Amino acid sequence: MTQEDRRTALASLAGIGLLVAGCAKHDVARKGGDDDAVTANEDLMREHGVLRRILIVYREVAPKLLTNAAAVDAAAIAVATTLFQTFGERYHEQMLEEQHIFPIVRKAGGEAAGLIDALLAQHARGREITSYVLDRTKSGRVGTGDAQPLARTLTAFARMYEPHAAREDTIIFPAFKKAVGPKGYDELGDQFEDIERRTFGGDGFDMAIDKVADIERRLGLADLSAFTAPAVA
């Protein structure tokens, strides 16, 4: 293992440690009563909501990299990408979708099953992109020669993941729920929650929401009203 590989591995492990530490503050059961119950698909889709907020970060910083890369908080991009890697790729994609949901949907057949290969290919491409982004931002600054390819890559990643998550929300997850039936759906929902708590040491969703909100504040993206479309001329 090269010195560069060691630094990358240590940074990744540090990211996981931060996520677990953050979860310790949110270790409160989500199923304290019927009103607090979270179904499997609701949980999956709100996890997508966290990841979509990271995509917004990517979309917003990309043009800024092209105009003044030195002014961009590259460390905040690295934190956002680490969150996508730990919460999105290693937990949501690998532990839930790839180990449980996709095999069930593929076995059930139909339209949803026909999407699985493309979704898996996009997961793999996303992980390649995540490694690239971390490599270009881990120093806390973006080099002049890296600004344009990084901006292009962030935009391409967001473009890929938006339809990816939308298909999962509207086709894959409903097919999964139908395939397992009411009893299996409830049991898998409990299993997914157990996986989340074992992985993060607490409520991973609450932790991720806190972290993404902090990233948005650092990058000046916390004001929702700033995204309101202008009036039609």
Label each region the model flagged:
Residues 1-233:
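Small-residue-biased structural context
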